[in-house]
């Protein structure tokens, strides 16, 4: 029996599960050379939510991150997680985009592609598999493990055979919710070894605490590889600690052969990063122990807590946890893994926060119910289906959802224009258009400012000298604060930094600037979330106020450049879409509750909103029966 090999998940799934994927590349770089010396089977370094959060929260280029990690780990394979037809996004992408993305990821440093589909629908894996085999990388087909009346050992084996037929080099049992038990693990690994005959890779989140025992039983049953994380990013929603597994298997025939001393040096580094970032340790609470009921994965748990905090509703976490399995059963028992974890979890949040189950439904949930994510594992509640689907077109179950996406690389390249300087930039835009456009615009502006400053400095006389570093600091302040323009006057000199699309700032106020300080400046304030108007007396009591059911961003149109869903004077029908509120990474259609006329659109496009912010006022056709704004 061969020794058990280990893959490190610290900088991908470990931080996604415990730190909401907020680890920066600066946190990683100093320790990567030591991690490269360990002798891991691979380091999981990319994919999952890391691509998204680089752009949304960390102001990092995910492609640059990958290249930097590769440069520091030349002796260790790098692995990434792909969501199949969703790649690292939350919707399906065309075959061409899948192929280009896989090829670019391999070119920039990825050696192992772990590919899963949230529904275990093999049709959503085909494009990834063919692209991986074409570029000569390692294709690890992953099975989304879950427990439900429709998920059986036979169904998992059938899917494993389909992955093998696509050319899988190894099979991952992906237990994202920590639902495996030691003896379930043993049975599954033995069955896969006997019937599939590929190396088995066990991925088991700690959550309820059984993962270390699962890994030991998997080794005894013949598993080849297991996932672990460095102790400061282990336990709780994450994975078992690598130090624990290495010590547990020492002097056995499964001995990993890894150096515990080196592993502890690495964990001491991560402990300092944890303290510096004020991140909590991974622990298993009573809520975690209830995983065998709610089945919420580690990464989903941390993001759910984060999103409830944004909604100012963290005190309702227990209610949401109780609602999740109910929603899951109603929509056919999808495994709770991205994107289904977000879709089901967000629906549970809406059901709890609004107090009216299924009154608000995200576009993504509607698409799933209509078949656009793939085939549901089990039957759905037909009353829910009828309520959600309405007049929407349901996809023929014999049609693979990916075939409907025909967007070409050339079309995307034309859309993003000169902002994209490489194939990777266009792919970034393909996956996250709004975030990529914002990121690329900002950084192209910075590059232009640097160029102009260099040109200016070469032509400036000594007596007219301007401190270029001071100006760069102003640019940084403008970028980070989101203001339109910063103007500073010092000793008769006037410096203005204006961001793209900004209006002119008010006249500058002279200030005294110490040489070592950041210049004080008069700035236009960043946008605040819209709030309810103080006085509704000017509006008839019969008008119905449509309010935001959640904290998020108001969008008046389905996409940039398209006409708004409705405008003042439009007739609307019951259940007609009025706008979108983006929250928790999902686009949530807000609909009219009744027939009427739009009398007021309260917000500009892309305005942040709080719970209860007025969005529209609608005059019902039967005004005497209408609900007034004070009771909406």
Where are these regions (language model features)?
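Active-site beta->alpha loop and helix N-cap motifs at the rims of alpha/beta catalytic domains
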Residues: 47-164, 171, 178-182
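Structured functional modules or segments
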Residues: 517-632
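Terminal or standalone catalytic/regulatory effector modules within metabolic enzymes
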Residues: 36-54, 285-291, 295, 299-466
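Active-site mouth loops of central-metabolism enzymes
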Residues: 10-30, 81-97, 116-119, 142-155, ...
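Glycine-rich phosphate-binding active-site loops on the catalytic face of alpha/beta enzymes
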Residues: 115, 175, 221-238
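Catalytic cores of alpha/beta
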Residues: 154-159, 208-221
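Conserved, mostly hydrophobic/aromatic
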Residues: 14, 35, 115, 171, ...
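Acidic, compositionally biased tether/linker regions
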Residues: 442-547, 632
